[in-house]
């Protein structure tokens, strides 16, 4: 393991402590969050979906839980059973659709609060789970520095929004710089 070379009051360490208090310790989890009024616009939602889908393509990533791939339980009255659908199918095309998604998420899907959204802070979050086998290897650092950070920066440049990122793999990589 790597020694923490940063002081306890360093912003990176403080952010990590806040992350642990809120989400607990998950050694392979990276959490990304947006906290801007522009989150629920078609442009930003679609770019957030693209970001999530891009991350899913990497072999270093086991799973990505984001607004676009949330399983939603729906009653099929004809078959008399429940089926699951994705929360967002395809592209968000209108502001009315974006507003509706926000309303459904915050009012009808409370079990996703804290994982995908935070109603109090108006944040939208994505959980990225790295392959546990690489968390303690150079492959983690290479992925974070050469793939993850550039993809996040591209999103930030395209939208003008700041992505808040935390989690053990991310913090350990930045701390080792």
Where are the model-predicted features located?
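Extracellular/periplasmic ligand-binding regions of membrane signal-transduction receptors
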Residues: 26-40, 85-86
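Short amphipathic beta-strand/extended segments in non-transmembrane regions
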Residues: 32-35, 49-77
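Extracytoplasmic
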Residues: 17, 23, 46, 91-177
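Transmembrane helices with small-residue packing motifs
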Residues: 1-11, 34
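Short beta-strand/turn "edge" motifs
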Residues: 30-31, 66-86, 108-123, 127, ...
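Charged, often glycine-rich, active-site loop that binds/positions anionic groups
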Residues: 24, 49, 75-92, 176-177
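Conserved, well-structured beta-alpha core segment at the onset of a catalytic domain
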Residues: 11, 24, 36-51
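Membrane-proximal juxtamembrane linkers immediately C-terminal to transmembrane helices
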Residues: 11, 15, 20-28
């Amino acid at each position: 393991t790597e020694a923490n070379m940063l002081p306890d009051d360093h912003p990176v360490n403080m952010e990590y402590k806040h992350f642990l208090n809120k989400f607990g310790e998950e050694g392979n989890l990276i959490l990304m969050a947006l906290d801007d009024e522009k989150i629920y616009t078609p442009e930003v939602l679609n770019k957030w979906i693209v970001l999530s889908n891009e991350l899913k393509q990497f072999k270093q990533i086991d799973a990505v839980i984001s607004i676009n791939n949330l399983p939603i339980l729906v009653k099929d009255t004809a078959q008399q059973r429940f089926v699951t659908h994705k929360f967002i199918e395809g592209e968000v095309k209108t502001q009315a659709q974006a507003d509706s998604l926000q309303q459904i998420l915050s009012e009808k899907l409370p079990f996703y609060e804290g994982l995908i959204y935070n109603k109090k802070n108006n944040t939208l979050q994505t959980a990225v789970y790295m392959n546990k086998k690489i968390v303690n290897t150079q492959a983690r650092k290479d992925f974070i520095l050469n793939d993850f950070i550039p993809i996040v920066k591209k999103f930030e440049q395209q939208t003008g929004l700041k992505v808040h990122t935390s989690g053990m793999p991310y913090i350990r990589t930045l701390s080792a710089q």
